[in-house]
């Protein structure tokens, strides 16, 4: 006895799956649609109608003829039961549709001509067509580099903020240097004020009249300089407050 080839065995298995196990008629897209019960057994719609007509099942329930599992009937209509989508795909893609399919049945190239060949004009009922969409990989353009290009956006406001910050730092350093020099000058004037009078008297007693007069005259001069310094300091503070940029 000659053994079947793998292709013939697969064909026989597919053909067996397309038959109802009660009436052994082939499923179709009209009266013998493959209906799936809750127990996952498949029965054609015509056989289910006969089971209901025989009255073997309670109202609103269908008893599976294979395992006696009860399946609730939504709206008490057989048509409300779910169809077996895999068998519907095989039925829909049968005949001339098979010629247009690729070798791998899970891959289908979507073109208008291919879709038109899969749908028969005579099938006016609602059919289910399951399609696996594949991504077609195209060769990348040779002009594009494989290294990703990242462009950093630097708003113009950042430059203005940086400039203002730099100017403020320079202005702050200048102001600090000016205040330090003024403080040193005040200390020198204070030292000169408190030491010039006794030093001048000592020089006058020592008969060094010229130097003594000079040192004694430094007392009112230092007072005048201190007054001028106080006035200049007030003016400078007002000027700095007006010119310094707001933070």
UniProtKB/Swiss-Prot annotation:
User: What EC class is this?
Assistant: transferase
Topology relative to the membrane? Multi-pass membrane protein
Q: Name one GO biological process term.
A: protein ubiquitination
Keyword presence, Transferase = yes
Pathway noted in the entry: Protein modification; protein ubiquitination
- Keyword list, A-Z: Cytoplasm, Membrane, Metal-binding, Transferase, Transmembrane, Transmembrane helix, Ubl conjugation pathway, Zinc, Zinc-finger
Please provide one cellular component term from the Gene Ontology annotations of this protein. membrane
Q: Which PANTHER family match?
A: E3 UBIQUITIN-PROTEIN LIGASE RNF182 (PTHR46675:SF2)
Q: How does it assemble?
A: Interacts with ATP6V0C.
Domain statement: The RING-type zinc finger domain is required for E3 ligase activity.
Protein name in UniProt: E3 ubiquitin-protein ligase RNF182
